[in-house]
Amino acid sequence: MGVDNLQLEPSVTPWSVDGSIDYDKLIKKFGTHKITDALLKKLKSIIGEIHPLLQVDFFFSHRDFDWILDRYIQGEKFYLYTGRGPSGMSHLGHLMPWLFTKHLQDKFDAPLLFQMTDDEKFLYGQDNSMEKIAKYTQENILDVIAIGFRPDRTKIIIDTKHIRYLYSMAIEIAKRITFSTAKAVFGFKNSTNIGMIGFPAIQAVPCFLPSLIEKKPTPVLIPAAIDQDPYWRITRDIAEKMGYYKPAQIHSKFLPSLESSGKMSSSKPESALLTTDSSEVIENKISLAFTGGQPTVSLQRKLGGNPDACPVFSYLRYLFDSPRNSTERAINCRSGNLLCGECKHDLSSNSVIFISEFQKQREKAKDKVSEFIYEGYSTETIG
């Protein structure tokens, strides 16, 4: 994913994330709300626990998550909606919002619509053929199923396959969003193809499909990385005019690149741990990973490291360490009592185990694909 449309420092768009991200500044820029202790307390009072990804602040921002909880308390169910742009093989950064989405599905018994935006990836990538995107779509679907979503509560929408279920709603949405608005939000230029200009209306459709399925306005919660927020911003602007609730969101941070700044990217395999990587490849990538440590052992012992700038620390914190262990690891890093090689060893061993187990579930998913594919709201209800 990469585009030169929005010139942010650093750059954060639905197609590109470059540089080191200041998430507090991003909250202000996008106009979202920080997840507070009070909101977490409210969530815990409903489901009895706080997911580790909330405890370590990986999910950090929201729009109307408090409203979703209020509606749920009042007895109104909500749908989940998230997705994937199939431009390559999936990596651990993709899995993290999906793992959290599964947690929400389990705790709230919420139906999930999962959108595969194969059309977007074809339109955006100059070198992407439909054949290549179709291959990645099928591969990515296996990753989604391997997460463990319930087939009776989960339906996967493939835009090009299911456009007949999306188009009527898409043009209703498109009619209400001006080019001026889309240009301001996404930074479209004269060189932008007209397919990309119209695509945001397609991505907005699953925000409102649950209302068609349920035959009444139905709340929707979108767990996704913060770079996708511009889509929901324009969708929220028109939702009530169309007779629907504004979609709520809960935003995650990015799993950083193994190479240093920016996010993990499947278009740069050396920067990411892919779900299809062998144990040897995983170990090699981690051994070469950038760290926040000093150039020599003696300097590390003397000066300590910087876990805040270390992708190895981030992976351990968000994926494998408990919040308490992560805090202890950071203290030991800064004091010089912990060396980068020790953290790399911990990450390597944990990643090999996690990905090898995930690959077993991925293999089993090949026999389950048909159970998850969407068949249209007119013939099937998943709520």
Go through the PLM ranges and name each one:
Residues F114-L123:
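Short, conserved phosphate-binding/catalytic loop or strand-edge motifs used
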Residues L69-G75, Q105-K107, P200-A201:
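Short glycine/proline-enriched loop/turn "hinge" motifs that connect secondary-structure elements
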Residues M1-G85, K155, V220, R236-S287, ...:
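Non-catalytic terminal extensions that flank enzyme cores
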Residues G305-A309:
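Small-residue-rich helix-loop
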Residues Y124, M130-A248:
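Divalent-metal (Mg2+/Mn2+/Ca2+)-assisted nucleotide/phosphate chemistry catalytic cores
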Residues G93-F114:
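Histidine-anchored nucleotide/phosphate-binding helix
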Residues H91, V144, D227, S261, ...:
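Divalent metal-coordination and catalytic microenvironments
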Residues G85-H94:
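Short, glycine-rich nucleotide/cofactor-binding loops
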